[in-house]
Each structure stands twice: as C-alpha cells, then as structure tokens.
Amino acid sequence: MKKLHPIMFAGTGSDVGKSVVAAGFCRIFKQDGYCPAPFKAQNMALNSYATPDGLEIGRAQAVQAEAAGLSPHTDMNPLLLKPQTDKTCQVVLNGRPIGNRDAYSYFNPKGRDVLRNEVNAAFDRLNSRYNPVVMEGAGSISEINLRETDLVNMPMAMYAGADVILVADIDRGGVFASAYGSVMLQRPEERKRIKGILINKFRGDIRLFEPGVKMIEELCGVPVIGVLPYFKDIFVEEEDNLQLASKARHASGNGKVSVAVVLLRHISNFTDFNMLERDSRVNLYYADSAEDISKANIIIIPGQQEHPGRPQPSATRRHGTGHNQGCRKRKDRCGHLRRLPDDGHDDKRPRRH
C-alpha cells in the first residue's frame, strides 16, 4: 500500500484526549489495511506497562499497540519518566531504568543530544517497518520555554516529517484561546506542519458550535477536521493522576460496597482498580480527606512512586488512615510495598503483603 506520512496527535494541553484519539486512529488504519504502529518519544507516567520481554513503556502506548494489532515494544515509547517527587523522576530509557534525575538537570541542554538520538533511532526503526507511525505528543505543544530541549512535540514532528493534528479540549473551556495560542506560538516552519485541528469532548447541540468552527479556522488558518463528542464509555487506562481529583468527587457507581482508594500525591499503578470501578456491586472513589475515608467499607492504600524513606506512613496519616476505626478492612496494594504497622507509627521494617 501507499506509504503514508507519519501523523502526530499533539495537544493544547494535558488530558485533552491525545492518547484515545491516537489509539482510535491506530485501529482505523489497521481496519483500512495498513500496518500502523504507535510512537511517543517521551512519556511521563506513574502507570507503566511491562512488555513481553519484561521492559517498561507507558500504558497508553500498550493500548495503542493493541489497537494496531501489535505486541508492545520499547521502540513505541523509548523514554519514560516516572515522577518520584515534584522535582525528581526516574528515567527509563528503552525500557530500563538508568537513574534518577532532577528536573533542572534533565532539561539541561548538555547531554540532551544523547537522549534525542535514542528517541530518533527508535522512531526510525518503527518507520522502516510500519505504515504509518501514529505519533502522540506530550502535554501542550506551546511550552516555548522548553523548546530547545523538547524531544516529543514539534521538534519530533519536524524530524519525522509528520503531519500534525492539534487536539483541543472544549469541555474544560477556553478552546478558542488554547487552539489559537498553540498554533501561533509555533515557529513558521513548525506551524506549516499543523494540518488540522480536532475539537474533542464536545457536549450539547453541535449546531450551536458551527459558527465556532469557522471562527477557529479563520483565526488559526488551519481547518477544523472534526468535532468529537464527550465519551464516557471509552476505557483507555490513564497514565497519570490528572483525572483522579474528579474521581474523588464522583464515585464510580451505586454498589452496596463502598471502597475508598487513598489519593496519595504520587500514586502509581492505580489502573489496578479499573475493574473495581466497573463492578456494579462496588462504589469506588478516590478519597483525599479523612471524612471521605471514614465513609468507606474498605480502604485501599495504593503504592506510590517515591524515594525510599517514610513517605507512606506520613502521607496516610495525613489522609486519616493511620487510626481510622470506622472501616472494616484496609488493604495495601503495590508490588513490594512497605505495609503500615497497625498503629500507624513509623516502622522501618519492610513488611510484604
């Protein structure tokens, strides 16, 4: 079949729907007879996926690989950052941890070419085998203060010769400003690569937005290629905890058993709880206060990606789980997680669940 240009779904911000849209297009290309493969040069995620050979990539690329009919591979996400604190993260390169870095040193131009060469090489390998490569950007494409060290958005699109589709979230408000700003803050040569704008998460009567479509096209000089409705039944696993604050306010169902997952700051692998969310017998929610926790029949203390030390006891005491007496059961959940002693006091002895 005809060799297609790589296509990148970039975003006006985080959580605008890039991962879902990219997964959808992986399946569409597959159904149309092509052999697509997903690619995200750099991912920041607390939830990772283990490939068949035991290496780590972002979960979104694993879902996209499934949509494309492929087995997940580290070339699909060669650089994975796993936050440990607000300023440090574990760097996973080609599926293997290579150490911890603070934000300032990670974005320092010195040594940046090494990482850039690695992600470019991973793309080249995919591009030589698959058609097309369905690329995903990260966060917003208009973080111009990081332009010179950017590995994943427009510089990656320029390297790949990709056609860029800008995904804008209308549900959060400000779609005109975010779309216009994202386009106009690009360099002229980068702006030329943006071939279309996709409005995502629309609610209501589309006829009311038809004038808005024309306004965006006139302002940005880029066609709006579609408007996607707000879907509630697409279960693509989240990579970070941006949606968990909303889940803290809205329970998953009306089941008889109330399950509270403590909303820790650096919670990881919370996708383990997805099946509970979909169980009609369970009312699962993420709790960030002692009052919310006290309403649960079962408390789950999740794992969190953080430096070794004493983060879990202090964090859980702050949330009110250390001495909670109104709950029937408490369950620690994470591979090799240190379990809290029953009285909630610090205890350096590791206890496996």
Feature locations, PLM:
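Catalytic nucleophile serine of serine hydrolases
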Residues: 337
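Ser/Thr/Gly-rich flexible loops in soluble cytosolic domains mediating phosphotransfer, phosphorylation
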Residues: 327-331
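A conserved active-site-flanking secondary-structure segment within enzyme catalytic domains
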Residues: 344-353
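Extended Lys/Arg-rich polyanion-binding regions
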Residues: 340
